[in-house]
Each structure stands twice: as structure tokens, then as C-alpha cells.
Regions:
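FAD-binding core/adjacent interface of flavoenzyme oxidoreductases
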Residues: 1-10, 26, 77-146, 224, ...
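Beta1-alpha1 glycine-rich phosphate/pyrophosphate-binding loop at the start
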Residues: 5-74, 152, 158-183
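Short amphipathic alpha-helical segments
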Residues: 20-21, 44, 120-123, 161-163, ...
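Hydrophobic/aromatic beta-strand patches that form the interior of the parallel beta-sheet core
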Residues: 31-33, 79, 109, 133, ...
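A Rossmann-like FAD-binding core segment of flavoenzymes
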Residues: 71-97, 102-105, 166-269, 308-315
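Glycine/Thr-rich phosphate-binding loops of Rossmann-like dinucleotide-binding domains
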Residues: 105, 118-119, 158-159, 181, ...
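FAD-site-proximal beta/loop scaffold in flavoenzymes
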Residues: 120, 126-142, 242-291, 298-301, ...
């Protein structure tokens, strides 16, 4: 019979590692399962300037490495094994990994995160973290007094473009249609901002550069014409921020747990899902702000609630 853990955490990003740290520190037997590499989105961040207490030289990978160390110090196990099947009903939850191994636990914490929807153009992957970003709050400061391009036409794209005007010299909003999906009030506010330039009926065809972004090729969605825009000679680079949506990593939980219409997991303030003993933490859940600091808070709350659940249910 396989070992029954107190807590199994699915996902080793900031939320999952925070949950693992708090769970293991509370003397619960804890296993963290990750399908790819530890860290989630933050491992693509070269500098972490908005996480309280992080040292100046902190990077996404270094912050995650320290979180992993802390989990290990308190006895949490971390294993790479993508989950392919799961049963969350009943007192003991069962997960099956891609390896064929079966895992059992009294509590499951879902911390699978959400990933930015990609633009799908050549150069996007190559220059992610080198001029291409998906987070204005995380990376806007790096483009102080530079030109940036904000891609998208929804509320988030226009709001983030306005946020970028706090740093950038000029913000070009690139949208594939001639009208925004964003609320009219948000668009009107952006139109009054002198730093914002609108580039309608355009998509990103290609991003070019040598080590860093140096030019962007836009395609006119009406005429098909291509236009290459180079960074100003004095700047050498510019930013490309993609705000074309996020994809919650919840495919595994469809028809198993309650999801909202966009695929995120609704929880209460204590991270409870609709299934007793199953919690969700971090970017995967319905929330207003998706940042490392909010993900780690979610993970801590989920772990503490898990401890209370186990004490009440099994002791």
C-alpha cells in the first residue's frame, strides 16, 4: 500500500512552495509534485524588485531556489511527475503520476498556476525576459524612459498600458481590430494620456534582435502590409508587453472540481474549493491580483487550513 501523505501539493511555483514550507514546518508529511521545472512563471524573470525583502541581486530562479531549500530543510519532498489521473472524493485523495506511481493524501492543494497566452510569433520565446514580458507590474520599471509596445485590446491590456506610462517614454497599444474590447471608460482614459499611441488593425508578425529586442515587425490586418519598427538609436532596445490573456492550468480538473467560465478555480478566503480537503492557491484561483507575493500568501493560508482540516477530521 502506498504511503498516505498528510498533504500533496500539485505545482512547485511560489504558491506550491509556500504551501509546502508551511505544511512541512507544521510537521505534516508533505509531497510537492511538479510536471516541469520548479518555479512556474517567475523563473523567466531576471530581476525580482517587487517581492518584499528580496535582495537587489535577486532573480526569479534564485528566489525559487531558496524556497526549494526551505521546503527541503523542513522535510517536504519535491518530485517531478506529471499527474494524469486523480480522484478527489472521499477522505483519502488519490493521484496517479505519468510514471505510473499512485500517490495518496488526506489533503490536496492545487497550485498549478496560470500561464500567459502567447502571441505566437517568431522571436517571442527567444526574447522572453530580454525585452518581451507578460507583466507590467513585474518588469515595467526596466523600461524607464524607453519606448514600449503593449499588445492586446481588452481591459487588462489598456490598463497595463496606462500603468507602463509611469515608466516608459512612449507606450504603443497594438490591437488587431479597429475597436477595443476594453470598457469605454478605460479607453477614454487612455486616449487622454499623451504618452499613449494607438496602433489599430495591427498584429505582431515577428520580434527581432541580437540578445535583446531591437525591432518589431507589425502586420496590418486589413492590407496584410508588414512594417518593421526599430528601437531608437539612443535606446538600443524597447519593451514588448503581451496582454492577450492567461490560461489557467486546470485542464486536469475539468469535471472534477468547480471552475469558473474562464477555467479558474473559485475559492473562499481560506482557499477552500467545493470539495472538502481540496484547496487552491496562487494564480490558478479566481483573484484580483496575480503576483508572487499574493501566491505565497495563498500557499501559506492553504497549508494552515489544511492542518486545521486534518486535526478536525482525522485526530
Amino acid at each position: 500500500m502506498s504511503k498516505v501523505y498528510d498533504v500533496i501539493i500539485i505545482g512547485a511555483g511560489p504558491a506550491g512552495l509556500s504551501a509546502g514550507l508551511y505544511a512541512a514546518r507544521s510537521k505534516m508529511s508533505t509531497l510537492i509534485l511538479e510536471k516541469e521545472k520548479n518555479g512556474g512563471q517567475i523563473v523567466t524573470t531576471d530581476e525580482v524588485a517587487n517581492y518584499p525583502g528580496s535582495v537587489p541581486e535577486a532573480t526569479g530562479p534564485s528566489l525559487i531556489a531558496r524556497m526549494v531549500e526551505q521546503c527541503n530543510e523542513f522535510g517536504a519532498e519535491i518530485k517531478k511527475d506529471p499527474i494524469v489521473e486523480l480522484s478527489l472524493e472521499g477522505d483519502i485523495k488519490t493521484l496517479t503520476g505519468n510514471s505510473g506511481e499512485v500517490y495518496q493524501a488526506r489533503v490536496i492543494i492545487i497550485a498549478t498556476g496560470a500561464s500567459p497566452r502567447k502571441m505566437g510569433c517568431p522571436g517571442e520565446k527567444e526574447f522572453t525576459g530580454k525585452g518581451v514580458s507578460y507583466c507590467a507590474t513585474c518588469d515595467g520599471d526596466f523600461f524607464t524612459e524607453l519606448e514600449v509596445f503593449a499588445i492586446g485590446g481588452g481591459d487588462t491590456a489598456v490598463e497595463e498600458a496606462m500603468f507602463l506610462t509611469k515608466f516608459a517614454r512612449k507606450v504603443n497599444i497594438v490591437h488587431r481590430r479597429d475597436e477595443f474590447r476594453a470598457a469605454k471608460s478605460i479607453v477614454e482614459k487612455a486616449e487622454k494620456n499623451e504618452k499613449i499611441n494607438f496602433m489599430m488593425n495591427k498584429t505582431v508578425h515577428e520580434i527581432k534582435g541580437d540578445g535583446i529586442v531591437e525591432s518589431i515587425v507589425l502586420k496590418d490586418t486589413v492590407t496584410g502590409e508588414l512594417e518593421e519598427i526599430h528601437a531608437h538609436e539612443d535606446d538600443g532596445t524597447f519593451g514588448v508587453f503581451a496582454f492577450v490573456g492567461y490560461l489557467p492550468q486546470t485542464g486536469l480538473f475539468k469535471d472534477v472540481i468547480t471552475l469558473d467560465q474562464t477555467g479558474y478555480i473559485p475559492t473562499d478566503d481560506n482557499m477552500n474549493t467545493n470539495i472538502p480537503g481540496v484547496y487552491a492557491a496562487g494564480d490558478v484561483r479566481v483573484k484580483s491580483l496575480r503576483q508572487v507575493v499574493t501566491a505565497t500568501a495563498d500557499g501559506a493560508i492553504a497549508a494552515i487550513q489544511a492542518e486545521k482540516y486534518i486535526d478536525n477530521k482525522f485526530h
